[in-house]
Amino acid sequence: MSWPHNKNDWPGLFEKIPNVVGKIIKCLTEHQRVDLLVKNTKNINNTRIYLKKIGCNISNIKFHKLETDRLWLRDSGPIFLVNKKNRKKIILDFKFNAWSKYKNFRSDNKINKHISSYLNIESILPKKVNSNKFERVVMEGGAFDNNGSSSILLTRECLLSSKQERNKGFKKIDYENLFSEYL
């Protein structure tokens, strides 16, 4: 998870957001560890105090100093895969471009490298061929759902939108080939 800090993502609502995220963390820390990305050391200290005050099990929280652009890691975070034969884990590190909507996403693109290094899991950068040069594929984790048995559920609007185009020139067949290769 990432601790909320970008007030522009929640116009007029930001003051309520830390409390909502805090409640989620409180529920989670009753049963499991939470890895929490926080902007800087000062914010880590303030966040720790706040979470302790609302009853979170602080011993189940691992704080990571890492600046992010927004808190929604479902889309910007890593995709974990497990090889069914040898149980080896890998991370698919897609490029994230904030839904082709916002200009601030560079920090979010550092999340997967941090997680890969912290967990000591190999990271793969899915690439596409475009104009005779290799480019990373832009993808949000929330754009698809995979059952681990060769079936995948995709969001056409997300992947093939001309208004918020993720991968210029990509067609349906390109995404089919991409998922066939990496998933």
Where are these predicted regions, by residue range?
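The feature marks the mature, well-folded catalytic cores of soluble enzymes
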Residues: 2-183
